[in-house]
Amino acid sequence: YKAPYGTKAMGALASAACASFLVEAFQDSFFGKVLGFQFLSEVGGANGSLSGVAAAILVTIAIGVTPGYAVLIGLSVSGTGIIPGFLAGYLVGFLVKWMERNIPGGLDLISIIIIGAPLTRLVAKLLTPLINSTLLTIGDILTSGAHSNPILMGIILGGTIVVVATAPLSSMALTAMLGLTGMPMAIGALSVFGSSFMNGVLFHKLKLGSRKDNIAFAVEPLTQADVTSANPIPIYVTNFVGGAACGILIALMKLVNDTPGTATPIAGFAVMFAYNPMIKVLITALGCIILSLLAGYFGGIVFK
């Protein structure tokens, strides 16, 4: 079974993550917490707090709702997370779309105000406890697993988070929703950092897109989600192997990262200096670069 407008909806979720969590990772985690710019920290916090609103608005636009109505129902989920906002916007969006088509002009606006906005918030509120408890439970399991078997956790987390980073999802959104901190978040941050180099080599070897596309994918994989969707096997397999290798190294180096949601190449690397000795971070990052370049090179040979 396929969800209606599934591809467009997932693209909207990725865009919402970029608009909220990516800005938060740069402005709040890096410029704010690491460099000490209070105003920029506020900018990041503002964007991050509206992830649910962004997801609800973008997904309703993606399924064909008029932008004005999409904003109307999207604003109603203010204060909720990205997944509850996304699901509420997606589900209620179809009703709003039907109301647009079948209710006379003028009355459709009143109907959406009276029915659509409250219903969207109600759905988001009902979903929030279930989603939060599920994700936090998973996050707790991963965090405790990092202490009992850090190498295995490095393989699982490093591989999985890097694959999610290249999918039409968001590693930032995933790690933020799971509430990962400590070693698991360090694995996520530096594994994704290493994947930039891996994917640059892989794209070049497989001749996927132009040089501009290669650079864009290396900086932020979500920008080239269409290329990933067209070539899933080589990209996902190579990224899992490279991410797992980086995860093992990071686990062995015992790095930590107490800023959730920083599984993004540049900000993820930068924020590591706030919680670990500089030399240790640089050595580990260099190791991740080498492992990732090797994974990208051999992945390009295998799948060429």
Place the predicted regions along the sequence by residue.
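Pore-lining transmembrane helices
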Residues: Y1-K304
